[in-house]
A protein has these predicted regions:
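Small-aliphatic-rich amphipathic alpha-helix that forms the alpha element of a beta-alpha
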Residues: 39, 84, 93-136
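C-terminal helix-cap and adjacent tail motif
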Residues: 4-5, 9-11, 18-19, 26, ...
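N-terminal amphipathic, basic helical "cap/leader" segment at the start of enzyme domains
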Residues: 1-82, 88
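Short, charged/polar surface micro-motifs in flexible loops or helix N-caps
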Residues: 58-63, 90-92, 131, 155
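A glycine-rich helix N-cap at a beta->alpha junction
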Residues: 74-79, 83-85, 139-162
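Conserved acetyl-CoA-binding loop of GNAT-fold acetyltransferases
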Residues: 16, 137-139
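Residue-level "edge-of-site" marker
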Residues: 52, 128, 147
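Short secondary-structure boundary segments
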Residues: 88, 127, 153
Length: 175
């Protein structure tokens, strides 16, 4: 599904959107390993790589555990073949990392774009109970849950949310 952009952009970016309908087609081990490899090679401040992901495939106990932390409005994500919880690590042996959340975002974007290149779509969500996720998954204290990602082949796009308009102005030249 191509968007109407004001200037041509990469087709991978142009076709990206966040569906709420996924086909019940599993994500292969080869493919989800590629997603995490793409995330691994993301840039990060001082190469600290302050991200960690927890993932599970549909119809497994781990998937049910991840899904339990979703808010009611994101119950649709339980139909995705793959759920991923992205965490940032805000301090390490070098001290506090003020860019940890930003770096997790870059890593997650790399993961999402790799998924897109493989023919999958993803939907990133903040709508989940972070404390519940920490408790249910027994996360180490330094792993701070920040984003949940549903990934799969796109389902019935006729059911998708109507597209939202994009900002007309998002940058200003400084002279």
């Amino acid at each position: 599904m191509m968007q109407n952009t004001t200037v041509p952009i990469l087709s991978l970016l142009n076709s990206r959107f966040s569906p709420k309908e996924f086909l019940q087609e599993p994500v292969s081990q080869e493919h989800y390993k590629l997603l995490f490899e793409a995330a691994r090679w993301s840039p990060s401040s001082y190469n600290r790589q302050p991200w960690f992901y927890y993932y599970s495939l549909q119809n497994t106990p781990g998937f049910e555990t991840l899904a339990k932390s979703l808010v009611e409005g994101n119950a649709w994500a339980k139909k995705a073949p793959l759920l991923i919880l992205g965490c940032y690590i805000d301090s390490d042996e070098h001290g506090k990392n003020a860019y940890a959340q930003y770096d997790l975002g870059q890593s997650t974007f790399s993961l999402v774009m790799q998924a897109q290149a493989l023919g999958y779509y993803s939907h990133q969500m903040g709508g989940f109970d972070r404390e519940k996720a920490k408790t249910l998954l027994q996360l180490p204290p330094e792993h701070i849950p920040h984003v949940m990602i549903a990934i799969g082949k796109i389902g019935n796009i006729d059911k998708k949310d109507p597209s939202r308009t994009r900002k007309e102005t998002l940058a200003k030249k400084v002279e």
